Amino acid sequence: MPIPDAANIDSRGVLLASSGFDQLKLSEDKSTIEVGAGNKWGQVYEYLAHYKLTVVGGRAGLVGVPGFLLGGGISFFGNEYGWASANVVQYDCVLANGDIVSSTP
């Protein structure tokens, strides 16, 4: 099932769509945010604008969060904070066997 306006694979591959994982949750102390893999940076920025906050994220709102971070992530804040991926506190991942694991730097 191709996804319009997205990078797609041919009919022999498996496409995992994460668009339903769109949760956004700011920590109580407002120092970290939980971002679901279905979000694009525009959604993250819009959510954080209500708190007058931002993140070391993508430079274009239509860019997906997971692909950007897994690719390193060049941000407008790169000179001050480095690559966006270096600012990730934790990844929660589902392994091929169904186990859920948390990975931290």
PLM features per residue range, with description:
Residues 13-17, 33-36, 55-57, 92:
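Structural recognition of the beta-strand scaffold that forms the well-ordered cores
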Residues 1-21, 37:
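Glycine-rich N-terminal segment of FAD-binding domains in flavoprotein oxidoreductases
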